[in-house]
Regions:
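HotDog/MaoC-like acyl-thioester-processing domains
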Residues: 3-9, 70-72, 83-134
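Hydrophobic beta-strand-centered segment that forms part of the acyl-chain substrate-binding groove
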Residues: 40-90, 104, 112
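Hot-dog-fold acyl-thioester-processing enzymes
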Residues: 2-61, 115-134
Length: 134
């Protein structure tokens, strides 16, 4: 991941996120990715864009590849970055690191820009595209 346009979110692992085997459940990883996704939207202005215009991202797909288990107690750090921008869709890659700075998982989201009033997809906003120039 290059250093351009990366956001970082640090979260504390909660004991309730553990599964029968004593490590963080896969569902919790997706919760972490959701938090990182929204944090990224806020940082690049997409959340504000939605609140002002009711135009915003809608999740089309999400994927996570697990590399190492996570354990309690501990913190995680999630680095998120724009992977691609097409006409109306875009992708974000998230890298989840454990307390030892080891890559625990990599997740990818594909989203579609959506007009929540007209209920149709729409082009990715040019002003935000310039901010994240990939």
């Amino acid at each position: 991941m290059s250093q351009a346009n990366i956001t970082t979110l640090t979260l504390r692992i909660d004991w309730s996120e553990l599964d029968l085997f004593g490590h963080v459940n896969n569902v919790a990883f997706m919760k972490y990715v959701q938090a990182a996704r929204v944090n990224y939207w806020e940082q690049i202005g997409l959340y504000k864009y939605y609140t002002e215009r009711k135009h915003g991202p809608m999740l089309a797909s999400t994927y996570c590849e697990f590399k190492k288990p996570l354990f309690y107690p501990g913190d995680i750090m999630i680095h998120s970055q724009m992977e691609f921008i097409k006409n109306s869709s875009f992708g974000i890659v998230h890298q989840i690191y454990n307390s030892h700075e080891e890559l625990a998982a990599e997740a990818k989201d594909v989203m579609v820009m959506y007009d929540f009033i007209s209920l149709i997809k729409m082009p990715f906003p040019e002003d935000i595209k310039k901010l994240v120039s990939i």
